[in-house]
Design a protein with these regions (language model features):
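Short, surface-exposed polybasic/aromatic micro-patch for ligand or macromolecular engagement
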Residues: 1
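Short, basic (Lys/Arg/His-rich) helix/loop patches that form interaction surfaces
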Residues: 134-146, 155, 192, 206-220, ...
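Basic, Lys/Arg- and aromatic-enriched nucleic-acid-binding interface segment
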Residues: 29, 71-88, 96-165, 173, ...
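Basic/aromatic-enriched alpha-helical hairpins
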Residues: 5-74, 90-93
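Hydrophobic (often cysteine-bearing) scaffold residues that line and stabilize catalytic clefts
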Residues: 11, 15, 19, 32-35, ...
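Conserved hydrophobic/aromatic pocket- or pore-lining residues that grip, position, or stack substrates
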Residues: 36, 47, 64, 87-90, ...
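Hydrophobic recognition helices of helix-based DNA-binding modules
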Residues: 47, 90-94, 202-205, 258
């Protein structure tokens, strides 16, 4: 009878069940939405389809490695290493809550290809930057994507923070964007002044998305913010390769040109 009970507990505590618990816990603790989105994407798309239904206490190093190798086979070495870290977080949470004996991801040290660190591609020539800004003005995709592209080089904030901008965070009177402390993992809200151009773009967006939570909502996923891929695809559509410019690179552009 005790053996049957233990077996039932194992079945109920699969990797995906424990993973969902951990995501909910992180959300309660105030983890940044962009961090939760990345974690959930890795779990839902890269890990749970292969090890999700296995009792968390029975996940073996080999099973986890096979799931990670699938990611590597697509050339996504950085994603594979990130997925290993996420799996480790789930397994350590399982250990801490008495549902597993150890974190088997530790056994995979050195098993994955180490992703080569690359700097975000950025335009640092003023004339080339001007050409990019003109190209953005001529973008004829969805208004949400175009507006996000327009404000990114003007705000000097991380793309994830911009995509998760909420109407409740915009102070029209003081002309600023107040990012809550929990989003930034800081003790105080992060204040971003809004220049005239940004305010005009936000005014245009207000008539389109004011009824929702996000300033730049996804057209496909109701109630969700614009995806990172949406902005990336827009830059590719404008004729800029990943080696020329990325949405993350705008901060490097700002640092370089302001220093000069």
């Amino acid at each position: 009878k005790q053996h049957k009970l233990a077996k039932q507990v194992a079945i109920e505590n699969t990797f995906e069940v424990v993973a969902a618990e951990l995501v909910a816990k992180r959300r309660q603790e105030g983890a940044a939405p962009v961090t939760l989105d990345k974690m959930k994407w890795i779990l839902d798309k890269k890990l749970c389809p292969y090890i999700g239904r296995i009792p968390v206490a029975e996940v073996t190093p080999r099973q986890l490695l096979e799931a990670l190798r699938r990611i590597e086979s697509d050339g996504l070495h950085e994603t594979a290493n990130r997925a290993k870290r996420v799996a480790g977080q789930v397994l350590r949470y399982a250990v801490a809550t008495g549902r597993a004996d150890r974190d088997v991801s530790h056994d995979l040290k050195g098993a994955l290809v180490v992703a080569k660190v690359t700097h975000r591609a950025a335009i640092t020539d003023p004339q080339e930057l001007g050409k990019l800004l003109v190209a953005i003005e001529g973008y004829n995709g969805t208004p949400e994507v175009k507006a996000a592209l327009q404000v990114t080089p003007l705000l000097f904030q991380r793309p994830g923070e911009i995509r998760h901008m909420e109407w409740a965070e915009i102070d029209w009177e003081l002309e600023r964007w107040e990012i809550p402390a929990h989003k930034m993992k800081m003790k105080q809200p992060h204040i971003v002044p809004l220049c005239r151009q940004v305010l005009e773009i936000l005014k245009d967006m207000e008539s389109l998305t004011r009824g929702g939570r996000y300033v730049f909502p996804s057209a496909r996923r109701g109630g969700r913010p614009l995806s990172e891929n949406g902005v990336r695809t827009a830059l590719r559509t404008l004729g800029y390769s990943n080696e020329q410019v990325t949405s993350h690179g705008f901060r490097a552009t700002a640092r370089t040109l302001l220093d000069e």
